[in-house]
A protein has these predicted regions:
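N-terminal phosphate/diphosphate-binding loop that engages ATP/GTP or pyrophosphate donors
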Residues: 3, 12, 17-81, 86-90
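Conserved catalytic-core segment of NTP-binding enzymes
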Residues: 3, 21, 103-119
Length: 119
């Protein structure tokens, strides 16, 4: 499967906007494996709105965590642990745009980082 992993060094640096642009210009699918923070809307909703694509091009998140924090901290506050086995790329018959959460070295749990999703 061909794809792109979109990352950035912080929140609000443009990962979601870049993901939406790639999605629309590459006729791709989009996946945000871990969504931390849901206000005012999730990144998946924003990407779909910006890219103006059908809902089936937006693949469901493995985790949606309410607090806008690093994934490992948001998961702790939600009382769960992020299981890397749930973070396998879903099937898609198009290129896949995967949007990370923060930079590559942001922890997902006690043993894994965002870079592990990109590998």
């Amino acid at each position: 499967m061909q794809g792109f992993f979109v990352t950035g060094t912080d929140t609000d640096v443009g990962k979601t906007v870049v993901s939406a642009w790639l999605l629309s210009h590459l006729d791709a699918c989009y996946w945000k494996p871990v969504q931390a923070g849901t206000e005012p809307e999730t990144d998946s909703i924003t990407v779909r709105r910006l890219a103006e694509v059908a809902e089936d091009r937006i693949l469901p998140e493995a985790y949606i965590l309410p607090d806008p924090l690093s994934p490992h901290e948001a998961a702790k506050r939600a009382g769960i642990a992020i299981d890397m086995n749930r973070l396998k790329a879903p099937a898609c018959d198009r290129p896949l745009i995967v949007e990370g959460a923060g930079g590559l070295m942001v922890p997902l749990n006690d043993n894994a980082f965002v870079i592990d999703l990109a590998a």
